[in-house]
């Protein structure tokens, strides 16, 4: 059997095995979550772009995280919503492979962006006097471009290894969308090489970055405890705790899905964890950052004040 043969033309995403009434309820609920994801991240991105006081490295990285979260959710959620309302639940092979590629690309990029954000916090708190030199705009741009490039390059490697396999037999994917581990189960050949490369990638983008983040936050915690003023400690801790919440949610779920040995009993658990990754995590990120960030709340307040002023001026002109 040749490795470049692909015989199936479409794939069935089993998704949620629920009745029509519950499917409509879930579709409505996830539609609200998806709308909140786009709205929350869109507002954060817009405020950062429009408010000059937020043109700093920390918010530059946060704007890219918002872009990733919107893209991540948009890659997975619309098809999942369509499948809830459609009993057929099929997806063509090429769109499925594209969804797998983008899912991996955005996930890896987010891992690396979160590492960059932790490094930014480390420099800001532990080396405040050298911050503007170390975190220059040139360095920030290079870090962001490297994160995006590595994310898409690693995803491309996995897609090339995936497409060399023959897909000639089963067509049912027990998942909410096309995800690489689930799609690999459809292959009619040994997937050992793919599994090894996936595990190696997990070590590179999950274990390694998480270790760097934890080490950086150990130094950050030591520096925060040395801050003399109570206000300074609270401000530094609130900024870092927001990032730690996001890191804990993202890396914790990803490591359970991709690094815990697979079994048939875990398929439903992985489905729920992937749902959290695709729907809840991107929705919660802007909420976590905005609730604990005085500068973001201040920028939003200024934007609303400007809008009210413009309405007043427009009303007077009329």
Curated annotation (Swiss-Prot):
Localisation: Cell membrane
Spans traversing the lipid bilayer: 25-48, 57-78, 100-119, 139-157, 195-218, 236-258, 272-291
Chain's gene name: OR2A2
GO process terms (BP): detection of chemical stimulus involved in sensory perception of smell
Keyword vocabulary terms for this entry: Cell membrane, G-protein coupled receptor, Glycoprotein, Membrane, Olfaction, Receptor, Sensory transduction, Transducer, Transmembrane, Transmembrane helix
Protein name: Olfactory receptor 2A2
Residues carrying sugar: 4
Organism of provenance: Homo sapiens
One CC-aspect GO term: plasma membrane
